[in-house]
Amino acid sequence: MQKLPKWKIFLSIICTVFAVICALPNFMQVNSKFLPHDSVNLGLDLRGGAHLLLDVDFDTYLNDSMENLADTLRKNFREDKIGYKNLLVRQNSIQLEVRSPEKLKPLKKIINKIDPEIIAEVNENKIKLSYSESRLNDLLNKVVDQSIEIVRMRVDSTGTKEPTLQKQGDKHILLQVPGEENPSYLKNILGKTAKLTFHLVDENANIEEAVKGHVPVGSMLVKGDNASHGEYYVVIKKKVVLGGDQLTTASASFDQNSQAVVAFSFNNLGSKIFGEITKNNIGKRLAIVLDNKLLSAPTINGAIMGGSGIITGNFTVESANELALLLRAGSLPAPLKIIEERSIGPNLGADSIESGKKAGLIGFIAVCIFMVWSYGVLGLFANIALSLALLYILALLSLFQATLTLPGIAGIILTMGMAVDANVLIYERIKEELHKGVSTLYAIRTGFESAFATILDANLTTLIVAFLLYIFGVGAIKGFAVALTIGIISSMFSAIIITKLLIDIWVQYFKPKKLGLV
Protein backbone atom coordinates (compact mmCIF):
# COMPACT_ATOMS: atom_id res chain seq x y z
CA MET A 1 0.00 0.00 0.00
CA GLN A 2 1.35 3.39 -1.02
CA LYS A 3 1.78 5.81 1.86
CA LEU A 4 0.19 9.21 1.57
CA PRO A 5 2.85 11.96 1.51
CA LYS A 6 2.45 13.80 4.81
CA TRP A 7 4.02 16.99 3.48
CA LYS A 8 1.27 17.24 0.85
CA ILE A 9 -1.42 16.78 3.49
CA PHE A 10 0.05 19.42 5.80
CA LEU A 11 0.74 21.83 2.92
CA SER A 12 -2.80 21.48 1.59
CA ILE A 13 -4.38 21.95 5.03
CA ILE A 14 -2.20 24.96 5.90
CA CYS A 15 -2.79 26.66 2.53
CA THR A 16 -6.54 26.06 2.67
CA VAL A 17 -6.93 27.29 6.27
CA PHE A 18 -4.78 30.33 5.52
CA ALA A 19 -6.84 31.04 2.38
CA VAL A 20 -10.10 30.83 4.35
CA ILE A 21 -8.74 33.31 6.92
CA CYS A 22 -7.54 35.76 4.24
CA ALA A 23 -10.75 35.49 2.19
CA LEU A 24 -13.08 35.80 5.20
CA PRO A 25 -13.28 39.66 5.18
CA ASN A 26 -14.93 39.46 1.74
CA PHE A 27 -17.96 37.70 3.27
CA MET A 28 -18.21 39.08 6.79
CA GLN A 29 -16.77 41.73 9.08
CA VAL A 30 -13.73 40.51 11.00
CA ASN A 31 -13.31 42.12 14.42
CA SER A 32 -10.33 40.15 15.71
CA LYS A 33 -7.06 42.11 15.71
CA PHE A 34 -5.15 38.89 14.99
CA LEU A 35 -6.91 38.22 11.67
CA PRO A 36 -6.67 40.05 8.31
CA HIS A 37 -9.28 42.76 7.74
CA ASP A 38 -8.68 43.60 4.07
CA SER A 39 -11.13 42.50 1.41
CA VAL A 40 -10.46 42.54 -2.33
CA ASN A 41 -9.68 46.03 -3.60
CA LEU A 42 -12.11 46.72 -6.46
CA GLY A 43 -10.95 48.75 -9.44
CA LEU A 44 -12.49 51.85 -10.96
CA ASP A 45 -14.70 49.91 -13.38
CA LEU A 46 -16.22 47.89 -10.51
CA ARG A 47 -16.53 50.46 -7.70
CA GLY A 48 -17.03 53.53 -9.82
CA GLY A 49 -14.94 56.63 -9.23
CA ALA A 50 -12.91 59.32 -10.95
CA HIS A 51 -10.50 59.00 -13.88
CA LEU A 52 -8.22 61.95 -14.68
CA LEU A 53 -5.39 62.32 -17.18
CA LEU A 54 -3.03 65.09 -16.08
CA ASP A 55 -0.52 67.01 -18.14
CA VAL A 56 2.60 68.28 -16.35
CA ASP A 57 3.25 71.87 -17.46
CA PHE A 58 6.99 71.41 -17.91
CA ASP A 59 7.38 74.67 -19.86
CA THR A 60 6.28 76.67 -16.81
CA TYR A 61 8.71 74.74 -14.62
CA LEU A 62 11.51 75.32 -17.12
CA ASN A 63 10.73 79.03 -17.32
CA ASP A 64 10.82 79.30 -13.51
CA SER A 65 14.13 77.43 -13.48
CA MET A 66 15.54 79.86 -16.02
CA GLU A 67 14.33 82.82 -13.94
CA ASN A 68 16.12 81.39 -10.89
CA LEU A 69 19.21 80.76 -12.99
CA ALA A 70 19.09 84.34 -14.26
CA ASP A 71 19.02 85.65 -10.66
CA THR A 72 22.01 83.44 -9.80
CA LEU A 73 23.90 84.72 -12.85
CA ARG A 74 23.21 88.37 -11.97
CA LYS A 75 24.57 87.79 -8.47
CA ASN A 76 27.72 86.05 -9.73
CA PHE A 77 28.33 88.64 -12.46
CA ARG A 78 28.15 91.44 -9.88
CA GLU A 79 30.58 89.64 -7.57
CA ASP A 80 33.06 89.02 -10.41
CA LYS A 81 32.52 92.50 -11.92
CA ILE A 82 31.45 91.21 -15.31
CA GLY A 83 29.58 93.89 -17.24
CA TYR A 84 26.45 92.78 -19.08
CA LYS A 85 23.18 94.15 -20.41
CA ASN A 86 19.80 92.99 -21.71
CA LEU A 87 19.73 89.81 -19.59
CA LEU A 88 16.33 88.32 -20.41
CA VAL A 89 14.57 84.95 -20.14
CA ARG A 90 12.98 84.02 -23.48
CA GLN A 91 11.62 80.71 -24.81
CA ASN A 92 13.20 78.57 -22.08
CA SER A 93 16.59 80.17 -22.56
CA ILE A 94 18.58 83.13 -21.22
CA GLN A 95 19.86 85.82 -23.56
CA LEU A 96 22.36 88.52 -22.63
CA GLU A 97 25.06 90.75 -24.02
CA VAL A 98 28.57 91.13 -22.60
CA ARG A 99 29.90 94.69 -22.57
CA SER A 100 33.51 93.57 -23.03
CA PRO A 101 34.53 90.58 -25.24
CA GLU A 102 37.45 89.69 -22.94
CA LYS A 103 34.92 88.87 -20.23
CA LEU A 104 33.52 85.96 -22.25
CA LYS A 105 36.03 83.47 -20.87
CA PRO A 106 35.43 84.22 -17.14
CA LEU A 107 31.69 84.35 -17.88
CA LYS A 108 31.79 80.82 -19.32
CA LYS A 109 33.69 79.63 -16.24
CA ILE A 110 30.95 81.00 -14.00
CA ILE A 111 28.26 79.30 -16.09
CA ASN A 112 30.13 75.99 -16.07
CA LYS A 113 30.58 76.24 -12.30
CA ILE A 114 26.85 76.82 -11.77
CA ASP A 115 25.78 73.96 -14.05
CA PRO A 116 28.06 72.13 -16.52
CA GLU A 117 24.96 70.98 -18.44
CA ILE A 118 24.24 74.55 -19.62
CA ILE A 119 25.05 75.12 -23.29
CA ALA A 120 26.35 78.60 -24.21
CA GLU A 121 25.88 79.75 -27.82
CA VAL A 122 28.10 82.78 -28.53
CA ASN A 123 27.52 85.22 -31.39
CA GLU A 124 30.00 88.09 -31.07
CA ASN A 125 29.11 89.66 -27.71
CA LYS A 126 25.66 88.04 -27.52
CA ILE A 127 25.16 84.82 -25.55
CA LYS A 128 22.25 82.40 -25.47
CA LEU A 129 22.13 79.93 -22.56
CA SER A 130 20.00 76.77 -22.56
CA TYR A 131 20.00 73.31 -21.01
CA SER A 132 21.42 70.32 -22.89
CA GLU A 133 19.05 67.65 -24.18
CA SER A 134 20.15 65.14 -21.53
CA ARG A 135 19.65 67.74 -18.80
CA LEU A 136 16.14 68.52 -20.08
CA ASN A 137 15.24 64.81 -20.06
CA ASP A 138 16.57 64.40 -16.52
CA LEU A 139 14.61 67.44 -15.34
CA LEU A 140 11.42 66.22 -17.04
CA ASN A 141 11.65 62.77 -15.43
CA LYS A 142 12.39 64.33 -12.06
CA VAL A 143 9.44 66.74 -12.29
CA VAL A 144 6.98 64.01 -13.36
CA ASP A 145 8.16 61.60 -10.63
CA GLN A 146 7.90 64.32 -7.96
CA SER A 147 4.45 65.29 -9.23
CA ILE A 148 3.25 61.67 -8.99
CA GLU A 149 4.35 61.40 -5.36
CA ILE A 150 2.82 64.75 -4.38
CA VAL A 151 -0.46 63.91 -6.16
CA ARG A 152 -0.51 60.60 -4.26
CA MET A 153 -0.05 62.40 -0.93
CA ARG A 154 -2.75 64.95 -1.75
CA VAL A 155 -5.32 62.46 -3.00
CA ASP A 156 -4.64 59.77 -0.39
CA SER A 157 -3.51 61.70 2.69
CA THR A 158 -5.23 59.18 4.98
CA GLY A 159 -3.98 56.11 3.10
CA THR A 160 -7.47 54.71 2.51
CA LYS A 161 -8.42 55.73 -1.05
CA GLU A 162 -5.85 53.54 -2.83
CA PRO A 163 -5.50 55.62 -6.01
CA THR A 164 -3.86 54.28 -9.15
CA LEU A 165 -1.11 56.60 -10.39
CA GLN A 166 0.86 55.84 -13.54
CA LYS A 167 3.16 57.77 -15.82
CA GLN A 168 1.91 57.87 -19.41
CA GLY A 169 4.18 59.09 -22.15
CA ASP A 170 6.75 61.75 -21.32
CA LYS A 171 4.71 64.16 -19.20
CA HIS A 172 1.25 62.73 -18.60
CA ILE A 173 0.00 61.20 -15.35
CA LEU A 174 -2.98 58.83 -15.17
CA LEU A 175 -4.94 59.12 -11.93
CA GLN A 176 -7.76 56.75 -11.01
CA VAL A 177 -9.50 56.99 -7.64
CA PRO A 178 -12.02 54.15 -7.07
CA GLY A 179 -15.06 55.12 -5.04
CA GLU A 180 -14.43 58.87 -5.38
CA GLU A 181 -17.84 60.53 -5.62
CA ASN A 182 -16.60 64.13 -5.76
CA PRO A 183 -14.34 64.68 -8.82
CA SER A 184 -14.55 68.47 -8.34
CA TYR A 185 -12.69 68.06 -5.03
CA LEU A 186 -9.90 66.22 -6.84
CA LYS A 187 -9.69 68.89 -9.51
CA ASN A 188 -9.55 71.57 -6.83
CA ILE A 189 -6.65 70.09 -4.87
CA LEU A 190 -4.73 69.15 -8.03
CA GLY A 191 -5.25 72.51 -9.71
CA LYS A 192 -3.18 74.31 -7.08
CA THR A 193 0.60 74.29 -7.12
CA ALA A 194 0.53 75.13 -3.36
CA LYS A 195 3.82 77.01 -3.38
CA LEU A 196 4.01 78.71 0.01
CA THR A 197 6.50 81.57 0.41
CA PHE A 198 7.26 84.20 3.04
CA HIS A 199 8.20 87.76 1.99
CA LEU A 200 8.84 91.04 3.76
CA VAL A 201 6.34 93.76 2.87
CA ASP A 202 7.74 96.76 0.96
CA GLU A 203 6.62 99.43 3.43
CA ASN A 204 7.91 102.30 1.23
CA ALA A 205 5.88 101.38 -1.84
CA ASN A 206 2.88 103.41 -2.92
CA ILE A 207 -0.08 101.03 -3.26
CA GLU A 208 -2.03 103.28 -5.63
CA GLU A 209 0.94 103.65 -7.98
CA ALA A 210 1.66 99.92 -7.79
CA VAL A 211 -1.93 99.09 -8.77
CA LYS A 212 -1.48 101.35 -11.82
CA GLY A 213 1.55 99.29 -12.81
CA HIS A 214 4.38 101.32 -11.26
CA VAL A 215 5.86 98.64 -9.00
CA PRO A 216 9.30 99.35 -7.49
CA VAL A 217 12.23 97.29 -8.78
CA GLY A 218 12.72 94.19 -6.65
CA SER A 219 9.09 94.19 -5.46
CA MET A 220 5.80 92.80 -6.71
CA LEU A 221 2.11 93.42 -6.20
CA VAL A 222 -0.05 90.68 -4.69
CA LYS A 223 -3.77 90.57 -3.99
CA GLY A 224 -5.39 89.37 -0.79
CA ASP A 225 -8.92 88.81 0.40
CA ASN A 226 -10.44 88.85 3.88
CA ALA A 227 -13.84 89.17 5.49
CA SER A 228 -13.37 92.69 6.91
CA HIS A 229 -11.65 94.45 3.98
CA GLY A 230 -12.65 92.35 0.98
CA GLU A 231 -10.07 92.43 -1.80
CA TYR A 232 -6.91 94.44 -1.10
CA TYR A 233 -3.38 94.80 -2.43
CA VAL A 234 0.04 94.69 -0.80
CA VAL A 235 3.46 95.35 -2.32
CA ILE A 236 5.98 92.75 -1.16
CA LYS A 237 9.67 92.15 -1.74
CA LYS A 238 10.32 89.62 -4.49
CA LYS A 239 13.00 87.94 -2.42
CA VAL A 240 11.71 84.82 -0.68
CA VAL A 241 12.97 84.92 2.91
CA LEU A 242 11.55 81.48 3.76
CA GLY A 243 9.92 78.72 1.71
CA GLY A 244 7.17 76.23 2.45
CA ASP A 245 9.60 73.37 1.84
CA GLN A 246 10.83 73.91 5.42
CA LEU A 247 7.41 73.03 6.90
CA THR A 248 7.05 69.79 8.85
CA THR A 249 3.41 69.96 9.95
CA ALA A 250 0.29 71.88 9.01
CA SER A 251 -3.21 71.44 10.41
CA ALA A 252 -6.51 73.28 10.60
CA SER A 253 -7.18 74.97 13.93
CA PHE A 254 -9.04 77.91 15.48
CA ASP A 255 -7.79 81.21 16.89
CA GLN A 256 -9.04 82.98 20.03
CA ASN A 257 -11.96 84.40 18.03
CA SER A 258 -13.03 80.90 16.89
CA GLN A 259 -11.97 81.71 13.33
CA ALA A 260 -10.51 78.90 11.22
CA VAL A 261 -6.74 79.16 10.80
CA VAL A 262 -3.90 76.91 9.67
CA ALA A 263 -1.30 76.11 12.32
CA PHE A 264 2.17 75.21 11.08
CA SER A 265 5.65 74.38 12.33
CA PHE A 266 9.07 74.37 10.69
CA ASN A 267 11.96 71.93 10.76
CA ASN A 268 15.17 72.88 12.56
CA LEU A 269 16.58 74.90 9.66
CA GLY A 270 13.26 76.62 9.01
CA SER A 271 12.83 77.42 12.72
CA LYS A 272 16.27 79.03 12.80
CA ILE A 273 15.58 81.14 9.69
CA PHE A 274 12.09 82.09 10.94
CA GLY A 275 13.56 83.12 14.28
CA GLU A 276 16.19 85.34 12.62
CA ILE A 277 13.61 86.95 10.33
CA THR A 278 11.24 87.83 13.18
CA LYS A 279 14.12 88.95 15.41
CA ASN A 280 15.59 91.34 12.82
CA ASN A 281 12.31 92.76 11.50
CA ILE A 282 10.26 93.65 14.58
CA GLY A 283 7.58 96.18 13.68
CA LYS A 284 7.58 95.19 10.01
CA ARG A 285 5.04 93.04 8.22
CA LEU A 286 5.71 89.51 6.98
CA ALA A 287 3.61 88.44 4.00
CA ILE A 288 2.52 84.81 3.67
CA VAL A 289 1.88 84.05 0.00
CA LEU A 290 0.36 80.94 -1.60
CA ASP A 291 0.67 80.63 -5.39
CA ASN A 292 1.19 84.41 -5.70
CA LYS A 293 -1.96 85.12 -3.68
CA LEU A 294 -1.62 86.89 -0.35
CA LEU A 295 -3.00 84.89 2.58
CA SER A 296 -2.05 87.33 5.33
CA ALA A 297 0.55 89.96 6.20
CA PRO A 298 0.78 90.17 10.00
CA THR A 299 3.02 92.64 11.82
CA ILE A 300 6.01 91.08 13.59
CA ASN A 301 5.63 92.01 17.26
CA GLY A 302 8.62 90.05 18.53
CA ALA A 303 11.06 87.27 17.81
CA ILE A 304 9.42 83.87 17.30
CA MET A 305 12.04 81.27 18.15
CA GLY A 306 9.76 78.23 18.54
CA GLY A 307 9.46 77.63 14.81
CA SER A 308 5.66 77.60 14.72
CA GLY A 309 2.85 79.98 13.87
CA ILE A 310 -0.57 80.32 12.31
CA ILE A 311 -1.83 81.48 8.93
CA THR A 312 -4.95 83.60 9.16
CA GLY A 313 -7.22 84.42 6.29
CA ASN A 314 -10.80 84.30 5.11
CA PHE A 315 -10.91 80.55 5.84
CA THR A 316 -13.81 78.21 6.35
CA VAL A 317 -13.14 74.95 8.18
CA GLU A 318 -13.12 73.14 4.82
CA SER A 319 -10.71 75.56 3.14
CA ALA A 320 -8.40 75.51 6.19
CA ASN A 321 -8.31 71.71 6.08
CA GLU A 322 -7.67 71.80 2.34
CA LEU A 323 -4.79 74.27 2.69
CA ALA A 324 -3.28 72.22 5.52
CA LEU A 325 -3.47 69.12 3.31
CA LEU A 326 -1.75 70.91 0.43
CA LEU A 327 1.01 72.23 2.69
CA ARG A 328 1.63 68.80 4.22
CA ALA A 329 1.85 67.18 0.80
CA GLY A 330 4.19 69.88 -0.49
CA SER A 331 4.09 72.11 -3.53
CA LEU A 332 3.96 70.70 -7.02
CA PRO A 333 7.16 71.31 -9.00
CA ALA A 334 5.02 72.28 -12.00
CA PRO A 335 1.33 73.09 -12.58
CA LEU A 336 -0.94 70.24 -13.65
CA LYS A 337 -3.58 70.53 -16.36
CA ILE A 338 -6.51 68.13 -16.60
CA ILE A 339 -6.73 67.03 -20.24
CA GLU A 340 -9.13 64.10 -19.80
CA GLU A 341 -11.80 63.48 -17.20
CA ARG A 342 -14.20 60.58 -16.73
CA SER A 343 -16.52 59.81 -13.86
CA ILE A 344 -17.89 56.27 -13.47
CA GLY A 345 -20.98 55.98 -11.32
CA PRO A 346 -21.29 53.28 -8.64
CA ASN A 347 -24.36 51.83 -10.38
CA LEU A 348 -22.33 51.05 -13.49
CA GLY A 349 -19.70 49.38 -11.30
CA ALA A 350 -22.39 47.35 -9.53
CA ASP A 351 -23.75 46.21 -12.90
CA SER A 352 -20.24 45.14 -13.94
CA ILE A 353 -19.81 43.14 -10.72
CA GLU A 354 -23.18 41.47 -11.22
CA SER A 355 -22.33 40.60 -14.83
CA GLY A 356 -18.96 39.22 -13.75
CA LYS A 357 -20.58 37.12 -11.02
CA LYS A 358 -23.11 35.68 -13.46
CA ALA A 359 -20.45 34.87 -16.05
CA GLY A 360 -18.21 33.25 -13.45
CA LEU A 361 -21.03 31.26 -11.86
CA ILE A 362 -22.38 30.00 -15.18
CA GLY A 363 -18.88 29.04 -16.30
CA PHE A 364 -18.15 27.30 -12.99
CA ILE A 365 -21.40 25.29 -13.05
CA ALA A 366 -20.90 24.32 -16.70
CA VAL A 367 -17.35 23.14 -16.02
CA CYS A 368 -18.44 21.15 -12.95
CA ILE A 369 -21.22 19.39 -14.88
CA PHE A 370 -18.87 18.57 -17.76
CA MET A 371 -16.17 17.16 -15.47
CA VAL A 372 -18.54 14.92 -13.50
CA TRP A 373 -20.26 13.75 -16.70
CA SER A 374 -16.92 12.96 -18.39
CA TYR A 375 -14.82 11.61 -15.51
CA GLY A 376 -17.21 10.59 -12.72
CA VAL A 377 -15.64 10.63 -9.26
CA LEU A 378 -12.36 11.99 -10.62
CA GLY A 379 -14.33 14.84 -12.16
CA LEU A 380 -15.78 15.56 -8.71
CA PHE A 381 -12.23 15.77 -7.31
CA ALA A 382 -11.32 18.19 -10.10
CA ASN A 383 -14.32 20.34 -9.15
CA ILE A 384 -13.24 20.39 -5.49
CA ALA A 385 -9.73 21.42 -6.58
CA LEU A 386 -11.22 24.12 -8.82
CA SER A 387 -13.30 25.47 -5.92
CA LEU A 388 -10.19 25.62 -3.74
CA ALA A 389 -8.30 27.36 -6.56
CA LEU A 390 -10.97 30.09 -6.59
CA LEU A 391 -10.64 30.36 -2.81
CA TYR A 392 -6.85 30.73 -3.13
CA ILE A 393 -7.29 33.41 -5.80
CA LEU A 394 -9.67 35.39 -3.59
CA ALA A 395 -7.31 35.03 -0.63
CA LEU A 396 -4.24 36.18 -2.56
CA LEU A 397 -6.08 39.16 -4.05
CA SER A 398 -7.14 40.16 -0.53
CA LEU A 399 -3.72 39.49 1.01
CA PHE A 400 -1.71 41.51 -1.51
CA GLN A 401 -4.45 44.13 -1.95
CA ALA A 402 -4.26 43.69 -5.70
CA THR A 403 -6.84 45.74 -7.57
CA LEU A 404 -9.53 43.59 -9.18
CA THR A 405 -10.90 45.04 -12.40
CA LEU A 406 -13.44 43.78 -14.93
CA PRO A 407 -10.63 42.42 -17.14
CA GLY A 408 -9.27 40.85 -13.95
CA ILE A 409 -12.53 38.92 -13.57
CA ALA A 410 -12.06 37.77 -17.17
CA GLY A 411 -8.55 36.63 -16.23
CA ILE A 412 -9.91 34.60 -13.30
CA ILE A 413 -12.54 32.96 -15.51
CA LEU A 414 -9.79 32.15 -18.01
CA THR A 415 -7.72 30.44 -15.30
CA MET A 416 -10.76 28.34 -14.37
CA GLY A 417 -10.61 26.88 -17.86
CA MET A 418 -6.86 26.42 -17.59
CA ALA A 419 -7.22 24.60 -14.25
CA VAL A 420 -9.77 22.22 -15.72
CA ASP A 421 -7.61 21.78 -18.81
CA ALA A 422 -4.76 20.59 -16.57
CA ASN A 423 -7.04 18.02 -14.93
CA VAL A 424 -8.37 16.87 -18.31
CA LEU A 425 -4.80 16.39 -19.52
CA ILE A 426 -3.92 14.35 -16.42
CA TYR A 427 -7.04 12.19 -16.65
CA GLU A 428 -6.51 11.48 -20.35
CA ARG A 429 -2.95 10.35 -19.62
CA ILE A 430 -4.26 8.09 -16.82
CA LYS A 431 -6.82 6.71 -19.26
CA GLU A 432 -4.06 5.92 -21.77
CA GLU A 433 -2.12 4.02 -19.11
CA LEU A 434 -5.20 2.04 -18.06
CA HIS A 435 -5.72 1.01 -21.69
CA LYS A 436 -2.28 -0.60 -21.52
CA GLY A 437 -3.53 -2.88 -18.75
CA VAL A 438 -1.36 -1.50 -15.93
CA SER A 439 -2.48 -1.27 -12.29
CA THR A 440 -4.58 1.61 -11.03
CA LEU A 441 -1.84 3.02 -8.78
CA TYR A 442 0.73 2.84 -11.57
CA ALA A 443 -1.66 4.50 -14.05
CA ILE A 444 -2.35 7.36 -11.63
CA ARG A 445 1.33 7.96 -10.84
CA THR A 446 2.41 7.75 -14.48
CA GLY A 447 -0.48 9.93 -15.65
CA PHE A 448 0.46 12.75 -13.28
CA GLU A 449 4.18 12.45 -14.02
CA SER A 450 3.79 12.45 -17.81
CA ALA A 451 1.30 15.35 -17.80
CA PHE A 452 3.31 17.48 -15.37
CA ALA A 453 5.91 18.70 -17.91
CA THR A 454 3.21 19.70 -20.41
CA ILE A 455 1.16 21.52 -17.75
CA LEU A 456 4.26 23.32 -16.44
CA ASP A 457 5.34 24.46 -19.92
CA ALA A 458 1.87 25.73 -20.80
CA ASN A 459 1.50 27.66 -17.55
CA LEU A 460 5.03 29.09 -17.65
CA THR A 461 4.51 30.50 -21.14
CA THR A 462 1.24 32.07 -19.97
CA LEU A 463 3.03 33.49 -16.92
CA ILE A 464 5.62 35.09 -19.20
CA VAL A 465 2.84 36.73 -21.22
CA ALA A 466 1.18 37.94 -18.01
CA PHE A 467 4.51 39.37 -16.81
CA LEU A 468 5.00 41.28 -20.07
CA LEU A 469 1.43 42.58 -19.94
CA TYR A 470 2.05 43.85 -16.41
CA ILE A 471 5.35 45.53 -17.33
CA PHE A 472 4.19 47.25 -20.52
CA GLY A 473 0.45 47.54 -19.92
CA VAL A 474 -1.50 50.23 -18.10
CA GLY A 475 -4.70 50.36 -16.09
CA ALA A 476 -7.05 47.50 -16.92
CA ILE A 477 -4.30 45.55 -18.73
CA LYS A 478 -2.26 45.44 -15.52
CA GLY A 479 -5.35 44.27 -13.62
CA PHE A 480 -5.84 41.44 -16.10
CA ALA A 481 -2.17 40.45 -15.79
CA VAL A 482 -2.27 40.39 -11.97
CA ALA A 483 -5.44 38.29 -11.84
CA LEU A 484 -4.10 35.93 -14.50
CA THR A 485 -0.81 35.43 -12.63
CA ILE A 486 -2.52 34.72 -9.31
CA GLY A 487 -4.99 32.43 -11.07
CA ILE A 488 -2.27 30.41 -12.81
CA ILE A 489 -0.32 29.86 -9.57
CA SER A 490 -3.49 28.84 -7.70
CA SER A 491 -4.78 26.55 -10.45
CA MET A 492 -1.42 24.79 -10.83
CA PHE A 493 -1.25 24.13 -7.10
CA SER A 494 -4.81 22.81 -6.97
CA ALA A 495 -4.48 20.67 -10.11
CA ILE A 496 -1.13 19.08 -9.25
CA ILE A 497 -1.22 18.91 -5.44
CA ILE A 498 -4.88 18.94 -4.34
CA THR A 499 -6.29 16.71 -7.09
CA LYS A 500 -3.49 14.15 -6.69
CA LEU A 501 -3.96 14.08 -2.91
CA LEU A 502 -7.73 13.56 -3.19
CA ILE A 503 -7.26 10.71 -5.69
CA ASP A 504 -4.60 9.05 -3.51
CA ILE A 505 -6.88 9.21 -0.44
CA TRP A 506 -9.80 7.78 -2.41
CA VAL A 507 -7.76 4.93 -3.90
CA GLN A 508 -6.05 4.03 -0.61
CA TYR A 509 -9.10 4.04 1.66
CA PHE A 510 -11.94 3.09 -0.71
CA LYS A 511 -9.96 0.82 -3.08
CA PRO A 512 -12.18 1.30 -6.16
CA LYS A 513 -11.96 -1.47 -8.74
CA LYS A 514 -12.43 1.02 -11.56
CA LEU A 515 -11.67 4.73 -11.86
CA GLY A 516 -14.58 5.31 -14.19
CA LEU A 517 -12.32 6.50 -17.02
CA VAL A 518 -12.46 3.53 -19.36
UniProtKB/Swiss-Prot annotation:
GO terms for biological process: intracellular protein transmembrane transport; protein targeting; protein transport by the Sec complex. Disulfide bonds: none annotated. GO terms for cellular component: plasma membrane. GO terms for molecular function: protein-transporting ATPase activity. Keywords: Cell inner membrane, Cell membrane, Membrane, Protein transport, Translocation, Transmembrane, Transmembrane helix, Transport. It is a multi-pass membrane protein. The keyword Secreted does not apply. The chain crosses the membrane at residues 9-29, 361-381, 384-404, 406-426, 452-474, 486-506. SUPFAM superfamilies: Multidrug efflux transporter AcrB transmembrane domain (SSF82866). It is found in: Cell inner membrane. Its main location: membrane. HAMAP family: SecD_B (MF_01463_B). Part of the Sec protein translocase complex. Interacts with the SecYEG preprotein conducting channel. SecDF uses the proton motive force (PMF) to complete protein translocation after the ATP-dependent function of SecA. Forms a complex with SecF. Part of the essential Sec protein translocation apparatus which comprises SecA, SecYEG and auxiliary proteins SecDF-YajC and YidC. Belongs to the SecD/SecF family. SecD subfamily. This is Protein translocase subunit SecD.
